[in-house]
C-alpha cells in the first residue's frame, strides 16, 4: 500500500526560497533513509502563495515507520529541523506532517 507523508510549510517569500534550497539538499538524504519521490509543491495560481508542501512516498506503513525512526535519530533532523527551521521561525512555520495512504490502489 503506497503511503505519502506531506509536510506543510508557510513562510515569507525569502523563507520559502530558503526552504526550496533546503528541500533540494534534503531530498537525497531522505532517499538514503528509504523515502521515494521527494517533491516540494508550490501554488502556481490562486491562494496559498505563502505555502509549500514537501512530500515523500513509501511502499508501506512499515516502510514509513522505519524511515521515521531513522530520521528522528539522525544528525539531519537535529541540524535541519530542530536548529535551522527553529531559527527561521516565525518567518518559516512548519504546520505539521499528514500521512496519507493510496485508497484506490489496484494490485
How would you label these PLM feature ranges?
Residues 3-10:
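Active-site-flanking beta-strand signature of metal-NTP-handling nucleotidyl enzymes
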Residues 4, 49-53:
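Short, surface-exposed coil-to-beta transition loops
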Residues 10, 55-57:
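Short hydrophobic/aromatic beta-strand micro-patches
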Residues 10-21:
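Short, surface-exposed ligand-recognition loops at beta-strand->loop->(often short) alpha-helix junctions
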Residues 21-39, 48, 57-98:
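An amphipathic, aromatic/His-enriched active-site/gating alpha helix that lines ligand/cofactor pockets
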Residues 45:
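Conserved beta-strand-loop-alpha-helix junction that forms the acyl-donor binding cleft
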Residues 103-104:
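Specificity-determining recognition surfaces
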Amino acid at each position: 500500500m503506497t503511503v505519502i507523508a506531506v509536510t506543510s510549510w508557510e513562510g515569507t517569500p525569502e523563507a520559502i526560497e530558503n526552504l526550496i534550497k533546503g528541500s533540494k539538499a534534503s531530498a537525497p538524504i531522505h532517499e538514503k533513509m528509504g523515502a521515494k519521490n521527494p517533491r516540494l509543491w508550490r501554488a502556481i495560481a490562486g491562494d496559498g502563495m505563502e505555502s509549500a508542501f514537501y512530500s515523500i512516498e513509501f511502499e508501506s506503513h512499515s516502510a514509513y515507520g522505519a524511515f521515521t525512526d531513522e530520521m528522528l535519530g539522525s544528525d539531519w533532523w537535529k541540524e535541519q529541523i530542530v536548529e535551522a527551521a527553529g531559527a527561521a521561525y516565525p518567518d518559516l512555520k512548519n504546520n505539521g506532517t499528514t500521512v496519507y495512504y493510496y485508497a484506490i490502489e489496484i494490485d
